[in-house]
């Protein structure tokens, strides 16, 4: 008789609002222009998969995952107290701010949900795509469900789901209005530091929103529009270190020994492969957009401790014909030239000299590819006492915006993983074939 299929049902064990473990300030806090940008009004969702630690479990060391993380979360919120607050509109300025109401007795707090699954992580392929368990079962959704207005005010929600093997998944929903990627990872790292027994957080958080420019008359473009946009297909591709080194070597040979990054190589290859697969007319204008960290341009010590939004969207423009027929080395050159413009272009934007152009605008135009590098944010280094995550799963609810996310591969093997949603279903095979072709 065939073995019964493993039970993958998620049981919610508890939900609560976690408050800072000590008293915290209650005065409202101003958000920067970039924090208040319309597309930041979203909860960014991700799953972080942690393998079991048999030696730790056998020795009975420490708390179980949910208890360890909940306890550390309450301690971390003493210094990161704005994350326990709520987004609100200032009565004075009419602008979005943080109402620091997360202290005990306040109406804030971080939603924390504990759940369990009776199967092992390996029974669900460690949550490789396609997910064997619905993402919404692993992400924190309080019950009863908040109204849209209530959810729009939330800043942070956490769920820890433990599996029968001792492994666990941490699901985060984090307001982009309060933290960008490096900022969110910084906070998660602080929770991990305390969960591992640390007495205090090594890098003290800094609010510091006044350092971020608020340009007079800064343009805010239209929001991405799903109407009329194509549905784009998900595809994850694991890339070997040999693959990356092959193209790095080509670049070095063509440039007299110059070096380029894995990000530059992989994004160049992805942009070219997508352009070829999409079969654009050669004269079609196409764009590559990617966020660059602006902390070194604005903040002392490179912005250590700052966790608000501090980035700039760089754009590389070309034609489909040029990108499709160029060598990967030449596409890398285009990207590197775009990156060099960061200091001057950011300075122009900060001075209000962009002449009606919104550099932060995200578009659903199929001709634009939006790429993100998650390998340098810090998520892959977060450790709650069981070691760093086996892998991190970025989640997107917008299947009409062409995206490509670079993450670290499973269990930190050499190489990288590309998580893409950038071509229509009928073009996925062509895109995949172009990506794996190293000629």
UniProtKB/Swiss-Prot annotation:
Q: Which UniProt keywords apply?
A: Acyltransferase, Transferase
Write down the EC number.
2.3.1.-
GO MF entry, a single one: hydroxycinnamoyltransferase activity
Q: Which domain of life is it from?
A: Eukaryota
The yes or no answer to whether the keyword Magnesium is present is no
Name the InterPro entries for this protein.
CAT-like_dom_sf (IPR023213), Plant_acyltransferase (IPR050898)
Q: What class of enzyme is it?
A: transferase
Pfam families, per database record: Transferase
The region annotated as signal peptide is none
- Disordered: where is this region? 1-25
The active site is formed by 176, 383
Q: Which PANTHER family match?
A: ACYL TRANSFERASE 4, ACYL TRANSFERASE 7
Function, as annotated:
Involved in the incorporation of ferulate into the cell wall. May act as arabinoxylan feruloyl transferase.
Protein family per UniProt: Belongs to the plant acyltransferase family.
Q: What is this protein called?
A: Acyl transferase 7
Organism phylogeny: Eukaryota, Viridiplantae, Streptophyta, Embryophyta, Tracheophyta
